[in-house]
Structures are given as structure tokens and as C-alpha cells.
């Protein structure tokens, strides 16, 4: 006997997970008012004004909520000491203000020219009643994407591409929530000696000693470890990528054109300071190959894409003197922020390679694409600066 909630298949009863679907539907219903931002984010101002002070529970993490407010920046300026008053969010971004924010937080905060995000309230916790809770603001773009802005650190993080994704994930793509609000374990899979070597390299990077990092990578080139990657929730991990120590000269021989592309991103006088290539991240992925057309004599599989041969995705790990780790793809020239430090990379894994934590300007790039650090402060294409900004 089968009912609406059960189905019989191969002699077994498969129970539908209506509970999870119902929970997601309820979470999406709580944030349906965010759909007013489609095409005109200013419509949210009237809604947040009428419902000012209301708290909406976030799907993740637990005990976190969104407190609606029509103008959260005004109250934050009056209640706290905010050093980035002229840095963000303006209607038009000037290179000088972007560089100032980058020098202080080691991260570019950039918004497209003429593009303005609409703030809807503060992101805070039920358990902690601290003035620092008012320094996180939730914003919505014209395309419906949801962002969180950390005013103290001058960070802008893309949380979701639409309301449905935000109702399912919450703050899962916020690196600050992963690094500070969760006690994640070390996700390295390697021996004791290799783990100690990577700990020594991480300690040298924390002390901004790039010469020591380069010397250790050159001496122990080829040593590798497996990094686990989180899926679905912060505590479920699967094998992600293999991190192998290397030197820049060896990679430049394999990718002759990548050196010039990298120097276009990290030029002399960059706010992140000098940098060095220390390791390579390699990940295997399947390619989708279309089936042969009907009548071609090949095997007919419904003319749908089938899994093809596996190829290796390669990315360089770049250590900067300012602290953060960057990831650079030598085949296409993309670059993004990988982690704040090696310790954060050990805990969070290489999720940034999939575009989860790329910091993008709204309306310019598709969600998941790696975005350059900042387009407004790039040097003009032509002769590269003579000043040396990297360590080979």
C-alpha cells in the first residue's frame, strides 16, 4: 500500500523528504519581500521603513537574524567609530577610496560605476549583544543578488544570486562566519612530517617573511598534501584538491604567457604588496562531451551530453605580504581571493576555487566566476612598471 508520502520501488519504500522541502518553503516565504528589488532596489526602502525593527531568522547559522532597517549606515555612523565613512558604499567608486580600503583590510571593495546596492538591515546574532553586530549590513542588488557588507573590515561578499538560494544557504558563503563563528577542524590529509612543514611555511607567511616562504618551497618542491572541501554544510568534507609546493620559475616554464597576465593583476605598487608563488592546486574534473548525432554511425545515447575524459584544473597559490592568499589560473588569467591565511585555508578548504567566495561587482560577472581584484586601479596596458613587485 502506498500513500501520497511514500512510494514503492524495487521492493523498498522510499520516503519523501517533505520536511526539508517544507522548511525551505517556509524560509523562502520569510524573504519573499526581497523580490521587490527586481529592477528597482529602492522599493525595499518603503518595506523596511514600515517594518523597521522586525527580526527575521536566517536559515544559517543558528541564532542569527536580520533586523530590518531602512538606513543602517546612518545609525552605524552615529553609534560606532567607522573609519570607512568615505570609502563605501558610494554611487561612483573612485580609485583612491578603493585603495584606502584595500590597504586597511587587504581586500578590494568595489562596486560598478552607477550601480548602487540597497541596504535592508543589520545581520546580527540572538546570543551576542555587541555593538559590533551593527557593522554587518545586508544589501540587495538590482539583479536580485544578496550581499553582506562588513563595515569594519570593508568587505563585500556575495551570498546568493537570488532569493531562493539565500533562503537555502543563509550566510554559508560568508568567510567571516566560517572563520570566526565556527570551530572547523583541520582538513589536511598528509603525514606528520608534511603537516609540520606546512605549519612552518604558514608561520613564516603570518610573519610576512616571503624570503623564508620561498626558500622552504624551493627546498621542499614537490611535497604535497590533500585538502578536503566542504559540501552542503560546514562539517561535511570530501577530497578536494592536491596542494604541491613549487617555485615560480618552474611554473613560468610550463605557462610562458601566465607571467605577464599575473603581473597585470599584481603590478608594482599594488596595495597587497610584494607576492610570491608558493604552491600549485590541482583538481580533477570531468568534461562534458556531446553524444554523436543520430545517423552518424556512432553510439546513440539520446543525443545528450555524457561524461568525457577527466582533465586537471591547475591554479597557483600566491602569498602576499599583506596577508591574504590568492588563487591564479594560468590557463585563462583569472584571479580571486583564496583565503585570509594558511590557517583559514586548512579549515575551509579550496571552496574559493569554485567561486563561492569571489568578491564581484554586481551586474558585471556571472555568479561563480572568479573576478579580478579591482578593475578601477589597474595600470594601463602597455609597458610594465620597472619596479620589482614579486619574488622569483
Curated annotation (Swiss-Prot):
Primary subcellular site in the record, as a coarse category: host cell
Function statement: Inhibits the host G2/M cell-cycle progression in a p53-independent manner.
Top-rank taxon, per record: Viruses
UniProt keyword terms in alphabetical order: Host nucleus
Annotated Gene Ontology cellular component terms: host cell nucleus
Family from the record: Belongs to the Roseolovirus DR6 family.
Stated name of the protein: G2/M cell-cycle inhibitor DR6
Compartments, record wording: Host nucleus
Free-text comment on this protein's domains from its UniProt entry: The N-terminus is involved in nuclear targeting.
Amino acid at each position: 500500500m502506498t500513500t501520497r508520502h511514500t512510494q514503492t520501488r524495487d521492493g523498498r519504500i522510499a520516503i519523501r523528504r517533505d520536511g526539508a522541502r517544507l522548511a525551505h518553503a517556509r524560509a523562502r516565504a520569510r524573504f519573499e519581500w526581497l523580490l521587490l528589488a527586481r529592477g528597482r532596489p529602492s522599493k525595499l526602502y518603503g518595506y523596511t521603513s514600515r517594518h523597521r525593527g522586525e527580526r527575521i531568522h536566517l536559515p544559517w547559522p543558528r541564532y542569527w537574524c536580520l533586523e530590518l532597517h531602512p538606513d543602517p549606515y546612518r545609525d552605524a555612523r552615529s553609534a560606532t567609530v567607522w573609519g570607512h565613512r568615505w570609502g563605501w558604499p558610494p554611487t561612483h567608486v573612485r580609485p583612491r577610496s578603493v585603495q584606502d580600503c584595500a590597504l586597511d583590510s587587504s581586500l578590494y571593495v568595489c562596486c560598478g560605476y552607477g550601480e548602487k546596492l540597497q541596504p535592508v538591515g543589520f545581520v546580527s546574532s540572538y546570543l551576542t549583544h555587541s555593538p559590533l553586530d551593527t557593522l554587518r549590513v545586508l544589501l540587495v542588488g538590482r539583479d536580485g543578488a544578496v550581499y553582506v557588507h562588513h563595515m569594519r573590515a570593508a568587505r563585500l561578499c556575495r551570498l546568493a544570486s537570488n532569493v531562493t538560494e539565500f533562503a537555502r544557504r543563509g550566510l554559508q558563503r560568508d568567510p567571516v562566519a566560517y572563520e570566526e563563528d565556527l570551530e572547523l577542524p583541520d582538513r589536511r590529509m598528509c603525514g606528520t612530517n608534511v603537516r609540520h612543514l606546512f605549519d612552518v611555511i604558514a608561520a613564516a607567511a603570518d610573519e610576512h617573511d616571503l624570503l623564508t616562504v620561498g626558500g622552504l618551497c624551493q627546498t621542499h618542491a614537490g611535497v604535497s598534501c590533500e585538502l578536503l572541501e566542504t559540501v552542503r554544510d560546514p562539517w561535511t568534507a570530501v577530497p578536494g584538491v592536491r596542494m604541491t609546493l613549487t617555485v615560480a620559475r618552474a611554473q613560468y616554464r610550463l605557462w610562458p604567457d601566465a607571467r605577464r597576465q599575473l603581473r597585470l593583476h599584481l603590478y608594482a605598487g599594488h596595495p597587497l604588496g610584494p607576492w610570491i608563488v608558493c604552491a600549485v592546486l590541482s583538481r580533477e574534473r570531468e568534461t562534458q562531451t556531446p553524444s554523436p548525432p543520430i545517423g552518424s554511425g556512432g553510439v546513440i545515447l539520446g543525443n545528450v551530453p555524457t561524461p568525457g575524459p577527466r582533465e586537471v584544473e591547475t591554479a597557483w597559490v600566491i602569498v602576499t605580504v599583506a596577508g591574504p592568499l590568492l588563487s591564479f589560473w594560468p590557463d585563462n588569467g583569472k584571479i580571486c581571493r583564496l583565503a585570509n591565511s594558511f590557517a583559514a585555508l586548512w579549515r575551509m578548504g579550496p571552496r574559493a576555487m569554485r567561486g563561492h567566495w569571489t568578491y564581484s561587482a554586481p551586474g558585471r560577472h556571472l555568479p561563480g566566476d572568479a573576478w579580478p581584484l579591482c578593475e578601477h586601479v589597474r595600470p594601463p596596458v602597455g609597458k610594465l612598471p620597472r619596479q620589482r613587485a614579486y619574488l622569483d
